[in-house]
Amino acid sequence: MRNIFKRNQEPIVAPATTTATMPLAPAAPADNSTESTGTGESQEDMFAKLKDKFFNEINKIPLPPWALIAMAVVAGLLLLTCCFCICKKCCCKKKKNKKEKGKGMKNAMNMKDMKGGQDDDDAETGLTEGEGEGEEEKEPENLGKLQFSLDYDFQANQLTVGVLQAAELPALDMGGTSDPYVKVFLLPDKKKKYETKVHRKTLNPAFNETFTFKVPYQELGGKTLVMAIYDFDRFSKHDIIGEVKVPMNTVDLGQPIEEWRDLQGGEKEEPEKLGDICTSLRYVPTAGKLTVCILEAKNLKKMDVGGLSDPYVKIHLMQNGKRLKKKKTTVKKKTLNPYFNESFSFEIPFEQIQKVQVVVTVLDYDKLGKNEAIGKIFVGSNATGTELRHWSDMLANPRRPIAQWHSLKPEEEVDALLGKNK
């Protein structure tokens, strides 16, 4: 480009060289100034040519302008994403190094503690390792206390247990109170259990109830008296508040005893599995007719020596604790899974249906001795759990049989509930 430009400027320089008298020195500045101007113009021309060439090449691409813009935006986003990933990776490395450094310091401190050394923080606060552990230990929970009495009649071989009162019980209900009652039994035999009445909404109940156990004095030393306080809940399992255990071999029964003892945390009782029974209920309001169908039972408790039972079912219609009518099924021999499918009807006017209970008891038939109860349930408006739901479903679906499985409960437990509902 510079050669072309010089060639174009030759006519200007030529006249100066033709004059013999003109000195050659002044011509140099003119040539330099002209040369610098030419260089500036050539750079602008080059940029313009490159620009035109670039746009010409773009125009040759068979894509609309918006597509090219979109491609440029995508390329920019990819570039930004790459930059972000690189920055994040660098930051993560720094954090990881700090974390490893801190972990190493922590391990070093732990090793120091194991060697019996004190770290700087403990030294500043004046705390020793033993003092720190003492602060972490929780204080024993206060579960309240129970007052009871013991009296043994040597002539009658009879132990009388008095459940007098409890105090400072913890609140287990939403209202800040509890509904306590006491279960009394002698270990290792859990079959014979007594229960006090439920005292509503109190943390300091006065029971003042007595219970007797027929036990020879020679056998009494191997037994443990348990008095467990529970919080009654109508719609769920009763929660244990605490218990008092009295090993009878540690008590001098030569004279009556009366004392207070602190309640200890009690273990949740594993309920004895007695089996399940399936019943169907049907009520026709217009006819005032209740039909109870005993369908079947399963997994019944073994009552006979051979590991089986001879089960049958009794049905009692009750009102206010009184038995109005009773029915019973046939006996099924040597089985723990009997199938009955027997129906029984009771005449109950609609205005009385909410005042009655149907008590279902599964018994083991014994030809020689007394028939023993395996388990029991009752349904009615004052029942709880699945029994109450079964009764409610029956009333909500008149003329329609409603079947439901129920877990059998100990006879004493059901009788206690029926007694409270009088």
Curated annotation (Swiss-Prot):
The keyword Cytoplasm applies. Changing residue 46 to A: Nearly wild-type binding of fragment 1-61 to BoNT/B heavy chain. Keywords: Calcium, Cytoplasm, Cytoplasmic vesicle, Differentiation, Glycoprotein, Membrane, Metal-binding, Phosphoprotein, Repeat, Synapse, Transmembrane, Transmembrane helix. It is a single-pass membrane protein. Gene3D superfamilies: C2 domain. Residues 1-60 are vesicular. Changing residue 231 to S: Impaired calcium-binding and phosphorylation by WNK1. Residues 119-139 have a biased composition (Acidic residues). Its cofactor is Ca(2+). It is found in: Cytoplasmic vesicle, Secretory vesicle, Synaptic vesicle membrane; Cytoplasmic vesicle, Secretory vesicle, Chromaffin granule membrane; Cytoplasm. SUPFAM superfamilies: C2 domain (Calcium/lipid-binding domain, CaLB) (SSF49562). Residues 16-30 have a biased composition (Low complexity). Signal peptide: none annotated. SMART domains: C2. The modification Phosphothreonine is found at residues 125, 128, 202, 386. Residues 31-41 have a biased composition (Polar residues). Residues 136-382 are annotated as: Phospholipid binding. Changing residue 47 to A: No binding of fragment 1-61 to BoNT/B heavy chain. GO terms for biological process: calcium-dependent activation of synaptic vesicle fusion; cell differentiation; positive regulation of dendrite extension; regulation of calcium ion-dependent exocytosis; regulation of synaptic vesicle exocytosis; synaptic vesicle exocytosis; vesicle-mediated transport. Residues 16-43, 102-141 are annotated as: Disordered. The first C2 domain mediates Ca(2+)-dependent phospholipid binding. The second C2 domain mediates interaction with Stonin 2. The second C2 domain mediates phospholipid and inositol polyphosphate binding in a calcium-independent manner. Homotetramer. Heterodimer; heterodimerizes with SYT1 in presence of calcium. Interacts with SCAMP5. Interacts with STON2. Interacts with PRRT2. Belongs to the synaptotagmin family. This is Synaptotagmin-2. It comes from Rattus norvegicus.
